[in-house]
Amino acid sequence: MRSPASTPSIRGGAFASSPILRHNHLPFLRLNPPSSSPTRSSPPSIQCSVQFRPCIDIHKGKVKQIVGSTLKDLKDDDGSDPITNFESDKSAAEYATLYKQDGLKGGHVIMLGADPFSKAASLEALHAYPGGLQVGGGINSDNCLSYIEEGASHVIVTSYVFNNGQMDLERLKDLVRIVGKERLVLDLSCRKKEGKYAIVTDRWQKFSDVSLDAKVMEFLANFADEFLVHGVDVEGKKLGIDEELVALLGKHSPIPVTYAGGVTVMDDLERIRTAGMDNVDVTVGSALDIFGGNLAYKDVVAWHNQQKVSVA
């Protein structure tokens, strides 16, 4: 069981077979959180079991698996291409339909670029599975509501709420005002820097001044329904999970949190369940056979279903 929030203030076979703030200085903790924020007397946010959260990463309109640390922000593009682990011949909508058929909710569609092809593909996925997918990539106050209207359950934001490496609280509050806390996911993806997990923005290329820790998660939980955290140092490399990061999330996140990065074998799912104290959901990308890897998607779905049985 996930403990309640206590603080006020991210292959063919499966298709065939399936039917802010600077670290330690929280300058706006003095400010009142939005009216929809949890309080000590609020009903607890409970998740009954660890879940597998599927993903659809879209780059130039195609479903791909990319080594996240090789992505470039468009305005800083030097002409080099990111390292691509896999490019699918299936559409984003086909993946969405697969996840819908298998009863997998809360997966994320990420647009790895601002091109119109990626946006069109993401909308096709949302239309194929209305209410079942979250969407991120270029989300801001001008377009966030439109994605909800197109069928997204939540919008995922990171770079928009940072400015020069610090959290822009006014932007964050605007998003809450427009779509509501209950439809907002904060992407707190991070990389290790000087022994701490620094939140990274702009396609994971820029370090913010914000380190992911208990106080930061406690505060930001007032403005979001969930967190999504990619372990960027291991993401897309199939080198194993960042167990230290998973443990940090499991111990300190007061709201549902999903970890992504480095899952290679089934044992990694159990390691996440254990290190995260049954509080951390998991996304698997490049390792899955539906994305060209060796880990059977059907086995991961079976593991997901077993988690629900275990707590029934």
UniProtKB/Swiss-Prot annotation:
Residue sites binding 1-(5-phospho-beta-D-ribosyl)-5-[(5-phospho-beta-D-ribosylamino)methylideneamino]imidazole-4-carboxamide per the record: 57, 68, 138, 158-159, 187, 203-204, 230, 236, 262, 285-286
Record flagged with keyword Hydrolase? no
In terms of SUPFAM superfamilies, this protein maps to: Ribulose-phoshate binding barrel (SSF51366)
Reactions mediated catalytically: 1-(5-phospho-beta-D-ribosyl)-5-[(5-phospho-beta-D-ribosylamino)methylideneamino]imidazole-4-carboxamide = 5-[(5-phospho-1-deoxy-D-ribulos-1-ylimino)methylamino]-1-(5-phospho-beta-D-ribosyl)imidazole-4-carboxamide
Q: What outcome follows a substitution of residue 57 to N?
A: Lost catalytic activity
- In this chain, Na(+) 2 is annotated as bound at 159, 162
E.C. number(s) listed in UniProt: 5.3.1.16
UniProt enzyme class: isomerase
Pfam families referenced in this protein's UniProt entry, alphabetically: His_biosynth
Location(s) in or outside the cell: Plastid, Chloroplast
Domain of life of the native organism = Eukaryota
Question: Which positions in this protein are listed as binding Na(+) 1?
Answer: 65-66, 235
Query: What keywords does the record list, in alphabetical order?
Result: Amino-acid biosynthesis, Chloroplast, Histidine biosynthesis, Isomerase, Metal-binding, Plastid, Sodium, Transit peptide
What is the protein name stated in its UniProt record?
A: 1-(5-phosphoribosyl)-5-[(5-phosphoribosylamino)methylideneamino] imidazole-4-carboxamide isomerase HISN3, chloroplastic
Task: Identify the species of origin.
Answer: Medicago truncatula
